[in-house]
């Protein structure tokens, strides 16, 4: 019985990870090829409320461009442990030099609290790494997720440039 339980649990984790990878690939596809947004929107219907709010957070870690795949995966796991339970559909992945968190229908104040606590936990768990967070604007409808991503990208770039821990796009004065 125990062996069957372990096998079932392992398969469940494997399927969950495979589904997470597929979802992250769909988002990456939209970020690199915005024309596919309608096609991807249909594919995400089961996992996300595509008519709801989307908000993107980018996490930059100094020297992350030096990480190999194993180190990146280890850091990704550490970062995920630093998040509180996120009470909404979300995805978390590495893309184009940043860890990307995309939340769906999460109140912006809740997201800000979660990212603030995550930052504090990360400082304790990974004291040798300096991290920067850029938080994009909450956007209605999946079609606008790329705009939240671009705004998060601008915010994290500013955070890195001026050595700030966290910047919300709305507070940039742009």
Which stretches of residues belong to each language-model region?
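Signal-transmission/dimerization alpha-helices at domain junctions
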Residues: 2-13
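Hydrophobic helix-rich structural segments at or within alpha/beta enzyme and signaling domains
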Residues: 8, 20, 24-174
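A conserved signal-transducing helical linker
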Residues: 13-21
């Amino acid at each position: 019985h125990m062996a069957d339980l372990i096998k079932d649990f392992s398969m469940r984790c494997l399927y969950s990870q495979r589904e997470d990878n597929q979802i992250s690939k769909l988002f990456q596809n939209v970020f690199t090829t915005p024309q596919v947004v309608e096609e991807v929107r249909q594919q995400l219907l089961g996992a996300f409320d595509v008519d709801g709010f989307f908000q993107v957070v980018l996490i930059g870690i100094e020297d992350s461009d030096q990480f190999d795949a194993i180190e990146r995966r280890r850091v990704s796991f550490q970062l995920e442990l630093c998040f509180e339970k996120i009470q909404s559909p979300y995805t978390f992945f590495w893309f184009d030099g940043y860890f990307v968190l995309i939340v769906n229908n999460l109140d912006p104040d809740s997201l800000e609290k979660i990212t603030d606590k995550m930052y504090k936990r990360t400082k304790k768990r990974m004291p040798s790494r300096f991290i920067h967070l850029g938080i994009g604007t909450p956007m209605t409808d999946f079609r606008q997720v790329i705009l939240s991503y671009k705004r998060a990208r601008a915010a994290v770039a500013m955070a890195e440039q001026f050595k700030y821990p966290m910047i919300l796009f709305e507070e940039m004065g742009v």
